[in-house]
Amino acid sequence: MALPEFTMRQLLEAGVHFGHQTQRWNPRMSPFIYGARNGIHIMDLTQTVPMLDQALTAIRDTVAKGGRVLFVGTKRQAAAPIAEAAEKSAQYYMNHRWLGGTLTNWKTVSQSINRLKEIDERMAAGAEGLTKKERLGMERDQEKLQASLGGIRDMGGVPDLLFVIDVKKEALAIAEANKLGIPVVAVVDTNCSPDGVDYIIPGNDDAARAISLYCDLVARAALDGMSAQLGAAGVDLGALEEAPVEEAVAEEAAGA
């Protein structure tokens, strides 16, 4: 099983090594800090590289065993890359706002997900029998629920691993995962504490390029795990890729 490859140069170009201002540091991150430059802490990338590799291995192995990964990143610059990476790798995400109890009170959350599915079905059927006011109210509910729960609507239960951008902002998500014994992979900046994180990735959690790089690598690791899972089940991945073309030809022949 091949892991996605990355180089220290890629990390440098993405600004992964830039921490926060030295006065805003968290002493718990001191083992991962190389030094300071112009009042900014610089991360020790010779540690980040192997730790990122370990994190990607954990993600790949989780998916290879049929596990689900939940991507969590609700800050503005993380929202889009988090959703794209999760969708690309057939995983799940929360990028709007972490709802308290998402993991620890899954039963209640799943009721809200069922409500979203019911609304979607009703709207798809044309919302028959509703007044204009009722329809507008339903559309508003649909938008709210989709923003909050759209990324986990098909998760079907609590995830097997969390991937988090910004441990300070997502402290509640990490606390819930810790309570349930769900492993956490997270990018930890110099102003944060690594406590509660099983697989620490010491790095910048604000720069758009850095966030995109983490998300891309994690998505690729999940896809590697998926191909390993399918391979172990005896599925011919080459045949899967060719199937849609063959089906299209068969359909054309049937219609001729």
From Swiss-Prot:
**Record InterPro entries:** Ribosomal_uS2, Ribosomal_uS2_bac/mit/plastid, Ribosomal_uS2_CS, Ribosomal_uS2_flav_dom_sf
* UniProt keyword list: Ribonucleoprotein, Ribosomal protein
UniProt keyword Electron transport, yes or no: no
User: PROSITE patterns attached here?
Assistant: RIBOSOMAL_S2_1, RIBOSOMAL_S2_2
One example of the protein's molecular function in GO is: structural constituent of ribosome
Family as reported in the entry's similarity comment:
Belongs to the universal ribosomal protein uS2 family.
**Which named protein is this?**
Small ribosomal subunit protein uS2
**Which gene is this protein's source?**
rpsB
